[in-house]
């Protein structure tokens, strides 16, 4: 497993051609950048909705519906802001805060993008090639 983020369409295409089944964009890309990257590949994207303070400390809860709209199929990575640093093991209290953050993101999705649904494992493959991607 490779833990490295990428931020341009050429590297996304290369990763897909090399067999990547999902791609993790750089954490702090704008929505416009994420939409453009989505247009370059058909594999799901792994997009962080938040990150630990030691890695920038951003929280994109209110952007989650728009991330899903422009990046689907997408795996939202939720709850990292509860951790002290990237890669640290969560405590029981951290896990509770991570679950709370996930519930808040789900609430935002239900409120602002109710038509979104969670796909079954593997169901997202090939969807992008068939869908219209609006940037």
Task: Walk through the language-model features, giving the residues of each.
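C-terminal extensions of enzymes
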Residues: 88-135
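Generic hydrophobic/aromatic pocket-lining and core-packing "Φ" positions
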Residues: 9-12, 34
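Alpha-helix-loop-beta-strand connector modules within alpha/beta enzyme cores
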Residues: 34-52, 100-108
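Conserved, mostly hydrophobic/aromatic
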Residues: 15
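Active-site-adjacent beta->alpha loops and helix N-cap segments on the catalytic face
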Residues: 27-42, 56-59, 91-95
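A conserved mid-domain beta-alpha-beta active-site/ligand-binding segment of alpha/beta enzyme cores
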Residues: 47, 58, 69-98
């Amino acid at each position: 497993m490779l833990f490295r983020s990428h931020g341009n369409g050429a590297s996304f295409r290369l990763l897909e051609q090399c067999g990547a089944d999902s791609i993790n964009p750089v954490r702090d890309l704008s929505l416009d950048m994420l939409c453009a990257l989505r247009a370059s590949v058909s594999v799901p994207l792994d997009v962080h909705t938040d990150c630990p303070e030691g890695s920038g400390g951003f929280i994109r809860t209110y952007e989650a519906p728009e991330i899903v709209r422009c990046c689907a199929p997408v795996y939202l990575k939720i709850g990292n802001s509860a951790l002290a640093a990237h890669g640290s093991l969560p405590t029981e209290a951290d896990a509770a805060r991570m679950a709370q953050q996930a519930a808040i993101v789900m609430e935002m999705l239900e409120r602002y993008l109710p038509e979104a649904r969670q796909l079954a494992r593997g169901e997202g493959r090939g969807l992008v090639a068939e869908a219209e991607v609006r940037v």
